[in-house]
């Protein structure tokens, strides 16, 4: 390796395995064009992977057979949010699936964001949807579990909550500190809050 490629690789080797990075993380090394070429070459050599256009990873290795572990779509979404300094929360079926409220595995992830709307096409064929929302108070939750419960109830509605789903939600609510619950219950729409309180008090 020579020049820009060596400097890019040296920086990547200093990262933890599993780290996700982007072309502009190397702007101090060279032009975007030269960095892009360096990353393409490192990918060809099997040293890094590209889970989506413009998104790269220094992959973790599994066992003695050196099997590469591809980063999860969730970790890619979180890395993008951190890079762009925006907030994201799972919503819809994605939130319900994370809580175990549906047995259907979600192939495409959906997030609400206070950033721009966009779609990320992953090399695996899956997609990550970021939908902009002006309802900024939904990012004010103290507790992530409360945030996801409210998001899931909004899509399932009261009619979609059978006894088993309410039992699962109740189990999750037991992990929420009372102080967090008292603050967060004021954030969702009134009808969602009423359902959460009823399950909490059950």
Tell where the protein language model's regions lie, with residue ranges.
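Short beta-edge/loop segments at beta->alpha junctions of small alpha/beta modules
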Residues: 2-80
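Amphipathic alpha-helical interface surfaces
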Residues: 35, 91-92, 145
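Short gly/ser-rich loop at a beta-strand->alpha-helix junction or flexible surface loop bordering the NTP-binding
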Residues: 51-54, 87-122, 127
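Histidine- and/or cysteine-centered catalytic micro-motif in compact active-site loops
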Residues: 53, 61, 93, 133-135
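Short amphipathic alpha-helical segments and their helix-coil junctions
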Residues: 78, 127-135
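Basic nucleic-acid-binding interfaces
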Residues: 83
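Hydrophobic alpha-helical interaction segments
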Residues: 133-202
């Amino acid at each position: 390796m020579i020049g820009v490629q060596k400097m890019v690789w040296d920086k990547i080797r200093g990262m933890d395995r599993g780290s996700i990075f982007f072309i502009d993380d190397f702007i101090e090394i060279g032009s975007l064009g030269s960095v892009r070429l360096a990353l393409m070459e490192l990918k060809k050599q099997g040293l890094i992977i590209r889970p989506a256009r413009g998104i790269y990873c220094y992959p973790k290795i599994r066992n003695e057979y050196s099997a590469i572990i591809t980063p999860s779509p969730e970790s890619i979404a979180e890395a993008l949010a951190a890079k762009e300094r925006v907030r994201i929360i799972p919503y819809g079926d994605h939130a319900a699936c994370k809580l175990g409220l549906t047995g259907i595995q979600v192939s495409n992830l959906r997030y609400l964001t206070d950033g721009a709307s966009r779609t990320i096409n992953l090399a695996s064929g899956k997609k990550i949807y970021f939908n902009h929302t002006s309802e900024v108070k939904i990012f004010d939750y103290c507790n992530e579990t409360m945030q996801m419960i409210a998001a899931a109830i909004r899509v399932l509605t009261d009619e979609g909550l059978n006894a088993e789903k309410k039992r699962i939600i109740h189990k999750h609510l037991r992990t929420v500190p009372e102080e967090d619950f008292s603050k967060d219950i004021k954030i969702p729409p009134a009808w969602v809050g009423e359902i959460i309180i009823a399950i909490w008090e059950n």
